[in-house]
Amino acid sequence: MADRPDSPLANPVGAGMAPSAEEPSAARARLIGQEAPDEGLPRVYVARRVMEFIEGAARRAGADGAAGFLMGRALRNPRGRRFVLIDGCIEAPEVESAGRSVKLTPRAWKALRSAASSAFEGREVIGWFHARPGEPPHLSPYETFVQQTHFGAAWQVALVYDPDSGQHAWWGWHGEALERLGGFWLWETPSCRLMAATELQRLALFEPAQAATSPGVREAAAAAWQRGTWPTSRAAQVAARRRHQG
């Protein structure tokens, strides 16, 4: 079992002061799988559209794998049990598959953090998801390390999805230990915020590596730099690269 450190993506309010609220009614949420009876584990409500978004991202990514941030709110019911409402998701624009792990690149981390802070007002980072085809859902040692170092708040969770089998598995914090959760609640809500990798690029939160490294762009940039005409601002550089790419 993994120890839980402080998380750099945690809400500064902290889980101990999570607002109190009623959980979604039975008419709006359906249990998928078997819920863990332990009151110390968070209960997870995920919007149906979020799950469909993740499943679509995983299918598009194929063997490369997919990942991203889960966005929403951390709450407590009137009896004190923690629960999370996940009604937002950001697809990572770039991942690396390393053995049995899915890794976010440093550029992807930066883009995800920027999107979470600028485009998801009223929501916080509830955790992350990643998808690997053809393997039973599990957390690799590297992914456990990611959960420890980046998603260590008491209410932050991890979702692993296998698009081949359709299996989902969730992990969350029980005190200082990272444990597998039981089922989750599929939640019907119209208010979702979903951000695909292409939207990160459109909003200039992420620039594909090939745009900066393709030979034509490199040569044009080098020539402009020597003439002293290559722009210094990031926005102007992006525009210049696009012009040279045609």
Regions found by a protein language model. Name each.
Residues 2-125, 134-231, 236:
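Conserved beta-strand-loop surface patch within small alpha/beta domains used
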